[in-house]
Amino acid sequence: MIEIMDTTLRDGEQTSGVSFAAHEKLSIAQVLLNDLGVNRVEIASARVSDGEFEAVKRVAAWAARSGNLDKLEVLGFVDGTVSLDWIESAGCRVVNLLCKGSYKHVTEQLRKAPEQHVDDIRTVVLEAAKRKIDVNIY
């Protein structure tokens, strides 16, 4: 089965120079999920700003009412529980966990041994499971 995951609403390099207001994110998410049949929508990166948090809360509230909550995803980081706390507080239930896949990234960017990064990932995934937050690893 092929699924479409849209990242338009996650402000950042994929939409360089573009930042959506909360009402715009809500309208776009509604069109993507209801009208275009997109399977999954990544709506934000965790911990970006207070404005982003409020936008995610607004979209998540609509998604919960309309049966689309499991289709909303938020990019999170291997940061203990910080991203999970943000995502859960915003009302979302799916984290796309950004993990490093190359030795160079782990050792030079994170300054960790690969085993430590794997342990850190495991810690986040286990905590997410306790909170009933689904995890996709990237």
Q: Language-model segments: what does each one mean?
A:
Residues 5-7, 92-103:
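Non-cysteine beta-strand/loop elements that form the S-adenosyl-L-methionine
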Residues 86, 96, 102-138:
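Hydrophobic alpha-helical hairpins/lids featuring a short glycine-rich hinge
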Residues 12, 32, 95, 137:
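Conserved, mostly hydrophobic/aromatic
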Residues 49-78, 116-133:
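Alpha-helix-loop-beta-strand connector modules within alpha/beta enzyme cores
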Residues 4-26, 71-80, 106-116, 138:
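Active-site mouth loops of central-metabolism enzymes
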Residues 37-63, 75, 99-112, 138:
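Glycine-rich, proline-tolerant flexible connector loops at the mouths of alpha/beta enzymes
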Residues 1-2, 37-39, 65-72, 91-93, ...:
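Short, well-ordered coil/turn segments that N-cap beta-strands
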Residues 25-46, 86-94:
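Catalytic domains of carbohydrate-active enzymes, especially glycoside hydrolases
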